[in-house]
Regions:
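Short, acidic/small-residue loops that bind anionic groups at enzyme active sites
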Residues: 102-127
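Short, glycine-/small-residue-rich phosphate/pyrophosphate-handling segment
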Residues: 126-145
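A cross-family phosphate/adenosyl-ligand binding-site feature
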Residues: 3, 14-82
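Active-site rim beta-loop-alpha module in soluble metabolic enzymes
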Residues: 124-132, 150-191
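Short, glycine-rich nucleotide/cofactor-binding loops
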Residues: 5-12, 99-100
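Glycine/threonine-rich flexible loop motifs
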Residues: 94-103
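Single conserved hydrophobic/aromatic residue that forms the stacking wall/gate
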Residues: 199-209
């Protein structure tokens, strides 16, 4: 298959590199990904401004834009080959429940709804998973499973896959579930001094202003 691969963590993130390596064993993979981390941008696009695209090779394009920009640019006017399916990930951090509304990983996947097969967003629930290689290899199997269905059986769908922190030994199979309502996220802590604000986010990473 011809696969368009993107993400929201950036073109050089561990997750996208791991799944690219795994997918390339049996498929043609074209990477169109953001230049830097774009987590939390949902399906936003760069409106009324130019977008810089850097061609690293025939199968790697780096975009100064959002994850959704990458999806639309890759599908509409960048790649000559017909794309069969769009894969977004592997994101390091879960995208479950209400989180899908602002997830850049899921937002990018939405751009592939008109393709032959439904777009697939993939996330690891842990920022440092036990075995990213296992998740990447299992993701390939799930991509092939999704694309084995007839189009009418899964039309107008977006597949959102989340891996708990598991490896080959602890894997017990897959379960298909609807999107649930997630608990209220932790209240952010804001610490002030004379020079900046420190915002302690729900993720393990602190943000400074």
């Amino acid at each position: 298959m011809n696969i368009l691969l993107t993400n929201d963590d950036g073109f050089d993130a561990e997750g996208i590199m791991a799944i690219r390596t795994a997918l390339e064993k049996n498929h043609n993979v074209y990477v169109v990904a953001p230049e830097k981390n774009c987590s939390g941008l949902s399906a936003s696009i760069s409106y009324l401004k130019e977008i810089e695209i850097r061609k690293e090779s025939e199968k790697l394009y780096i975009v100064k834009g959002t994850p959704a920009d990458c999806a639309y640019i890759g599908l509409l006017n960048l790649l000559n080959n017909e794309i069969d399916v769009l894969v977004s990930g592997i994101n390091l951090g879960a995208n479950i429940g209400n989180d899908v509304l602002y997830s850049g990983t899921v937002g990018a996947a939405l751009g592939g709804r008109k393709l032959k097969f439904p777009p697939i967003a993939i996330s690891s629930c842990e920022y440092i998973p036990k075995s990213l290689e296992f998740i990447a290899n299992k993701s390939c199997e799930l991509v092939e499973l999704v694309t084995s269905f007839k189009k009418q059986e899964i039309s107008n769908k977006v597949v959102n896959i989340n891996f708990p922190d598991i490896d080959e030994e602890s894997y017990k199979g897959i379960k298909v579930v609807p999107i649930a309502k997630r608990d209220t996220p932790p209240t952010p802590n804001i610490l002030k001094d004379n020079s900046c604000l420190l915002y302690t986010s729900p993720s393990p990473r602190d943000l400074h202003w």
